[in-house]
Amino acid sequence: MLNIRHLWVLGIWELGETNLFILQSIIAVGMGAFVIVDRAVAVYFIWGNFELTTLVLLITFIGGSGVVKMAVFVHNRRQYHSLANQLDELLSLQRGSCSEDPNLAAILASSRRKAARLTKGLLLLMLSQTLLWISVPLVAYPEESRLPFVQHQWDHNNKFYEISYIVQSLSAVWVSQISLGVDCLFAAVMILVAAQLEILVHRLLNIRNDVDIVCKETAILEKKELDSKSDENMYDELRLCIKTHQDILRFVAFLQDIMSPIAMTQFVMSVVITCMALFQATYSEEFSAVLKCASFLTIPVGQLYLYCWAATNVTAQAEAVSAAIYSCSWVDASERFKRALRLIISRSQKPLVLTAGHLYPIDKGSFLTMKKPARK
């Protein structure tokens, strides 16, 4: 999986303990520590300058969000490994159905491509934005010793300027890639889960009584035998669908527990950063400060929307499962089939909604609601 390989390169996902991975982990921890210390010291020395302090705090919160998510991820590393293993098991449940039906196979393949393209696109976008920020001082202020993110007011950037520039740049790239990489991992998982629910919808719709298509000339005795076999096949397929549905719900519950702390961190940080950026953009008299604040908004808002969009797809497909149940050939089915059908009906009636911190629903409605206070 592309997301796992990416996080392994950054030193927070272990694919076998090697000297290389230990070095990668040390670099990740070092970059995270530098981001916190460098930003905190910078805020201390400029405290009292409203506009400059607000701008540095924005940078601090963005970097701090990545460091917090990295710390949570590393602390719960075994649970994330378990999540990956359970996802593989979940994808294998309907592999047989996908191999028999090209349409189902196309849904699965499309979800994998979507997850990979989304991950590549967003990570490259984040990298390009970070590199743009890194290059601004060299292009806009070539004669001044200015650092890309926060300035060292205590020595006016005179001491260790080159080293400070390089470390600030590397730490920004490393931490931002970790922050968005974790978000893309969860988004990719939710895309694959939504695809599994969509495949289940098609399987439920395909449950039908084959006797309905038997020719009228078929003998009555033969028709009864076919009816018995068809009912048995319908019941067996329904049992498999119920088991798959239960396995998907269990996986989503586990995903909820794993994702909740990081999603809550992203929600809180996104709201704080958005409010601070809009506040300074509104009251600042310098146009350059307004542009800087506006450029910051794309990062937290984009990360927040990523969660809401992916989780909404899961909820929508879960609702589609409920609708598909009533569309299968249950009217002329046996009582045994109808009793089994009640199980999946009763469970699918409860909305499948992911939450941040087990408190706030993650969906597009919540995204719009959280943006309203920031615009006021």
Regions found by a protein language model. Give the residues of each.
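Helix-loop-helix junctions within predominantly alpha-helical proteins
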Residues: 1-57, 89-190, 195, 199-226, ...
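Generic structural signal for well-ordered, non-membrane alpha-helices
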Residues: 35-38, 62, 82-85, 89, ...
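Cytoplasmic, membrane-proximal interface of class
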Residues: 42-47, 71-79, 248
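Inner-leaflet juxtamembrane helices
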Residues: 69-88, 186-188, 194, 198, ...
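Terminal membrane-anchoring module of integral membrane proteins
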Residues: 1-21, 101-111, 120-129, 138, ...
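Short amphipathic alpha-helices and their capping/turn residues within compact interaction modules
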Residues: 62, 85-92, 96, 198, ...
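Transmembrane alpha-helix/interfacial motif
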Residues: 52-73
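A broad detector of the eukaryotic-type serine/threonine protein kinase catalytic domain
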Residues: 65, 69, 175-178, 182, ...
